[in-house]
Amino acid sequence: MERNHWNEKSSGAKRSRERDLTLSTIRSILAADERLRIKASSYLGVGRGVDDEAVIDIFPTGQTMSFLRLLHGFLGTCRGQSMHQVLRDPCVLRKQLLYGVCKTLFDTITVRRVAEEWKLHAALFPYRALDEEDLEQYLLVWSASLRQSVQTGVLGALRDILYQYADNDDYGLYVDWCVTVGLVPLLDVKTKPSEAAERAQFVRAAVQRATETHPLAQDLLQANLALLLQVAERLGAVRIANAPEVRVFKKVRSERLEAQLRGKHIRLYVAAEPLAYERDKLLFTTPVAHLHEEILRYDGLCRHQKICQLLNTFPVKVVTASRHELNCKKLVEMMEQHDRGSDAKKSIMKFLLNVSDSKSRIGIEDSVESFLQDLTPSLVDQNRLLPARGPGGPGVVGPGGAVVGGPAGHVGLLPPPPGPAAPERDIRDLFKKQVIKCLEEQIQSQVDEIQDLRTLNQTWENRVRELRDLLTRYASRREDSMSLGARDAELYHLPVLEAVRKARDAAPFRPLAVEDNRLVANSFFSQFVPGTESLERFLTQLWENEYFRTFRLRRLVTHQGAEEAIVYSNYTVERVTLPYLCHILALGTLDPVPEAYLQLSFGEIVAAAYDDSKFCRYVELICSREKARRRQMSREAAGGVPERGTASSGGPGTLERSAPRRLITADEERRGPERVGRFRNGGPDDPRRAGGPYGFH
């Protein structure tokens, strides 16, 4: 009942309008948020999850891609790497499926069905003798023929089905993901109705073809047709993702591992979860992750060996190194040049400046005198050159032409002057010679300086060229590392001439003159190729130890100790094959195959599954029952039946009344005993005792 307010409007109507307005507002907010989310996700790309959560990429990355490359021989191939091929053998899965299906088929048989088969055989080929050896041979022939018929029919049908639907590399891809990343991306394949009908038709046709002449095998397979269809359907319903668009990542906040294929989420099976102890980085615990660093080191040595083999083919190779140009000899030469007293350029420039500043004859004479004294002070006789300006003032000519004068009483013998113009000519000639000498020295010094600068320029040019080559080489190495070594791997597959050309481009050798500023560091007069045998043996041991200890593979050896084969063990089946069978194919009801059966052929595996099944036990039961019944009938036929009323040894007048027994007529003896009754004291023989493969000896 609604209450009316003074404005004649009910409170319920008011609340209804407010509720509608609130709901409308909420819807508008949600719609706007959805549009914003869609627009934001279109800009974020695949690097984010649906909820914009930060992720750590696991695959593909440079590290995980190198895992796959080195696993299949593209990096660091050695003898021990073949251990992986043993583990990824697809025949293991086919033999596991064959054994599991056969064991299930043979265990579904009933003892009544085996007894009916025996009755049919006994009615067609009745046994008429009472000899135990003949009876045992008769039963042996029946059991062996029944066994062969069933095994042939089952083997033919299952072989066609397995090679049709299990003849792919999914198991190998599963093993590759397990030993490299530890995570297996799974792609569920949607089956169309037409494909399901075609698969069912193929299975029925395979059963019909294989069991046309084996009725019991046909009945057995027809009764278990649902199991065969399930195996074929599961083999085609799941695929291991094998495409460049596969992406595996881990969400940081929720710590969930997810996989995507072309932007769509797919299933992910976790075989070995990576460790997340470092921020924004995962540590892998797989066998290949443990071997990764050693494989890269070995691969680098192999590439170095290949480059040396391609390049070190010339008769002589010289490696030079730069040495410092300021050695001892150079230092001494520079010191001597610096300590030299006279400088021709400075002297002639000083002379020209003095002459230009002179205003009189006396100033010019002083300039000439200073110039000559600076150049050749010991070769010029100042008294003869300028008698009036000698160092001792005006001299006194003594007898015989001796001139006495000077501060220390210098006495010199001078020849008589040839004439008034002789001193002037001597000064001119000497001045001209000195000027020419100064110019020659100046020119020579300029030439020497030019030569030194040229040598220094050549040295720096060589240095710049070396630095440029180093930069080019480092840039090429960076490009090679970004391209994951694809170009380096081509050296092993290219023709010789093409490989030599690429190697020379990568590490060019050029002729170089050994100058004064370079010295010879090393030289090669023959081909040098480093050895990799020791490192290869070490890496092989690492491969074997890692796989043997992780998966517990079994090594088969001959009597001489030589290795014959490396096979799966029971632990390997439980570690590798059963997870694929249970978690991926969803066929966990199949029994695991024993390790001893993995070395057998398909026919031998079917025979082994027959021996381990109830089918074989029921056949043994029927044979034991027939032998016991025949023994009982033989004892009854061998013993006589006394007449009634015959006196016995118990005493006079006493009669022994025996149980009434029917005598066997000649016709019954000719036709053989009736197939009635059960055995009393018989027991099944051991089918595994020595003497034959099937028992009944």
Curated annotation (Swiss-Prot):
The keyword Coiled coil applies. Its main location: virion. Residues 664-689 have a biased composition (Basic and acidic residues). It is found in: Virion; Host nucleus. Residues 633-697 are annotated as: Disordered. One of its GO terms (cellular component) is host cell nucleus. GO terms for biological process: chromosome organization. Keywords: Coiled coil, Host nucleus, Viral genome packaging, Viral release from host cell, Virion. It comes from the Viruses. Belongs to the herpesviridae portal protein family. HAMAP family: HSV_PORTL. Forms a portal in the viral capsid through which viral DNA is translocated during DNA packaging. Assembles as a dodecamer at a single fivefold axe of the T=16 icosahedric capsid. Binds to the molecular motor that translocates the viral DNA, termed terminase. Homododecamerizes. Interacts with terminase subunits TRM1 and TRM3. This is Portal protein.
